[in-house]
A protein has these predicted regions:
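Flexible, solvent-exposed loop/hinge segments and secondary-structure transition points
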Residues: 22-698
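N-terminal non-cleavable signal-anchor helices
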Residues: 8-10, 209
């Protein structure tokens, strides 16, 4: 991967031109419009087979012109895989690494695994481009790379981590929320085989300004990320993907480089349309490409049958799995429609209507949340979102767009809802957040199993080592081996947490109740505590230098690592079943291999470690949690926190936020002057109000 050091910022490139000559801005504007698409499609735009064929063919044309061989995937907005194409000579496998450009060695986690199918990398990149983007923002895998690393921006020192630190381990193949592909295009949202991707070369696709899907390309054999934002890369994956999206590119005014996050400009791409050496007119039909030996559609077990390209779904119609909700159910306290949306199955039934809990918080069934309370929580949170100013959407002043999930103390989904045009990634993530806050607030549980006991029952994480190069599919399984070191155990994180906090019974059934919001748990999951200064110790749920990377983050990955490897083995054709729809309790590459032992629903789709959730209490009794995701993390915090507070005020049933004296920010951590954070709300959050500090004192 060659680096081209530039001192010009992206806006200067747009204004003055860069790359292959002419005006960069003019070329980018032209990339948005597809002359061949004559019929207007708005508002019901979707990717037709002709669109999918064109996107793939344009990628192949650019790769061929550069003498490269690529693997290309196209998905619709909810993750239906519409095409996977592999050029002759393309690498069958990629290596996961965060150190390809930066040097150094990281041992453990997913680092250095070199037997990952290139098809899975391409699919995850395409899904990332689709899931992070909406009609108000267009983010790419390069944007993802920028916002998930240990410092924001990457390459800077002594600054906090990225706002979406940890989001890469969402949409997991073992998620109990994400759908699984069938023989036909069907209702989503669907899983991503490797979670979300930070490897440049994944872009959203648009028609008439409407987000309709994503494209992912892998050609360099490396599944990595960009650790330095002080330059612009020449990245072959990204260049080919830029060619693929010609005519289907995001409107320039909503691209990531038009969005600021805590005062820093997001990055959309380091490659531009005027750098291409092919044009859309060079694209040949897939039949012609097959006939001349350039490449073919390829089957990917669990995702795509390889027979033919497919049309996508119309987002917002029942066929997509997301549709408008009943306005008489999702309404504010005055009966006004909240313009909410819900997730539906293939029969157009709401997958997650509000329902009463069946747990017994504090040993009493009367403490369990009722269906009416759950619906009010969803409505109040959506109402707060509709009143709030978005962080990552254009134009400034747009409403926040999010997904909300409510769970009981066992992690069972009690209800989900979303606002119009919220990014898809927020669905699975909001559920992760709700479950994580609830789970880690379970110290002193009088009913059910305490978190420490559940974690101690999880099988050990079985890190694998890379296999000899070049990877031979016929001997791959025989060459797989478990690393001797590091060899983490999940129970080790429990011990580390208790020691770090100075609370020996934290997470235990006998301990005093402590309420952890996701912001609190996220503080404990950073490679340095407190988040930012690089001379602090690793958080107890993180890892030390030499072991930590975005592909080896600590408990968040180790809890689901075995399940991810189970899925990779299944796709590779190893004679094992696909991973169950529960990310916990997988034995991994052990004897017996890929079995489930002591699985639990509390974290069934994995845990999340960036802000946007709070536990829900009735008095001083934990009764569940709420998670919000889709916009800025401070907005997510506020929507969840105020949603619970306003529900409590409206219903007067004792439901509310955790009492202040129980919150994690009250813990005095030994040898630390910085306390955990609970929630952080925007200073001036509402569109039509000058109200400030809206969460203070609550």
């Amino acid at each position: 991967m060659k680096r081209l050091t530039l001192v010009l910022i992206l806006t200067t490139l747009y204004a003055c031109g860069g790359g292959g000559g002419g005006s960069t801005l003019e070329a980018e504007v032209q990339s948005v419009n597809q002359p061949e698409v004559a019929e207007e499609c708005a508002p019901d735009c979707f990717l037709q087979t002709s669109d999918v064929n064109q996107v793939v063919a344009q990628a192949v044309a650019e790769a061929s012109a550069r003498g490269e061989a690529a693997t290309i995937a196209v998905v619709d907005r909810v993750g239906n895989v519409l095409a996977v194409y592999q050029m002759t000579g393309a690498d069958d496998f990629v290596t996961i690494t965060s150190t390809f450009d930066a040097g150094g060695t990281i041992v453990g986690g997913l680092e250095s695994l070199n037997f990952i199918p290139a098809t899975l990398a391409a699919i995850s990149k395409a899904i990332t481009g689709a899931y992070l983007s909406t009609s108000g923002n267009a983010f790419t895998t390069r944007t993802a790379s920028q916002i998930i690393q240990e410092n924001f921006n990457p390459g800077e020192r002594n600054v906090p981590s990225g706002p979406l630190f940890g989001v890469q381990f969402s949409q997991l193949p073992c998620s109990d929320f994400s759908q699984r592909a069938s023989d036909t295009v069907s209702t989503g949202p669907f899983r991503a085989p490797l979670g979300l991707s930070a490897d440049p070369g994944g872009f959203p696709l648009y028609k008439e300004g409407i987000a309709v899907g994503g494209v992912g390309v892998i050609a360099d054999g490396i599944y990595g990320l960009d650790k330095n934002l002080n330059d612009f890369d020449t990245d072959i994956d990204e260049l080919i993907a830029v060619a693929a999206m010609q005519g289907y590119a995001a409107p320039t005014e909503i691209r990531a480089d038009q969005v600021t996050i805590v005062g820093k400009t997001a990055r959309f791409s380091d490659s531009f349309s005027d750098e291409l050496i092919s044009s859309p007119s060079d694209a040949q039909s897939l039949e012609a490409l097959s006939a001349n030996g350039t490449g073919n559609l390829i089957a990917v077990q669990g995702y795509f049958d390889g027979d033919r390209t497919r049309s996508g779904t119309v987002f917002g119609n029942p066929e997509s799995g997301i549709r408008p909700a009943d306005p008489t159910v999702f309404s504010d306290s005055n009966g006004n429609s909240l313009d909410a949306f819900i997730f539906v199955d293939e029969n157009n039934n709401n997958r997650y209507p509000a329902r009463g809990a069946t747990d017994t918080p504090g040993g009493l069934t009367t403490n369990a949340m009722t269906a009416a309370e759950v619906q009010t929580l969803l409505n109040e949170a959506i109402n707060v979102a509709n009143l709030s100013r978005a962080q990552i959407r254009v134009p400034v002043g747009t409403q926040a767009r999010v997904t909300i999930s409510v769970v009981d103390t066992n992690g069972k989904i009690l209800g989900m809802g979303r606002t119009r045009d919220g990014p898809i990634f927020g669905a699975d993530v909001s559920l992760q957040k709700a479950r994580t806050a609830t789970f880690f607030s379970g110290t002193g549980r009088l009913s059910g199993t305490a978190p420490a006991e559940l974690l101690r029952g999880v099988p050990a994480t079985r890190y694998l080592s890379p296999v000899p190069q070049p990877v031979d599919p016929t001997t791959l399984v025989a060459n797989l081996a478990v690393l001797d070191s590091p060899a983490p155990t999940i129970s080790g994180y429990v011990d580390a947490l208790q020691e770090f906090l100075g609370v020996r019974d934290a997470l235990e059934a006998t301990g005093a109740v402590v309420a952890f919001a996701d912001r609190s748990g996220g503080n404990l999951s950073r490679p340095n505590y407190p988040d930012g200064p690089d001379n602090g110790p690793p958080g107890p749920l993180s890892k030390p230098p030499g072991e930590w990377s975005v592909f080896s983050v600590g408990l968040q990955l180790d809890l689901v690592y075995n399940a991810i490897i189970n899925h990779v083995a299944f796709v590779l054709g190893v004679p094992v079943p696909d991973v169950p729809q529960n990310c916990t309790g997988n034995t991994g590459f052990a004897d017996p291999a890929f079995q489930q032992v002591n699985a639990f629903e509390n974290l069934a789709n994995g845990m999340q470690i960036f802000p946007g959730s709070v536990p829900i209490f009735r008095g001083d009794i934990l009764i569940g949690g709420i998670g919000v995701s889709g916009d800025g993390v401070d907005q997510d915090d506020m929507i969840s926190f105020l949603g619970v507070h306003r529900t409590g005020e409206q219903l007067n049933t004792g439901l509310g936020n955790a009492p202040q004296e129980l919150r994690a920010d009250r813990i005095a951590i030994p040898n630390q002057t910085s306390r955990l954070r609970y929630v952080s709300c925007p200073q001036l959050p509402f569109i039509d109000s000058s109200q400030t500090e809206v969460c203070d004192g609550l």
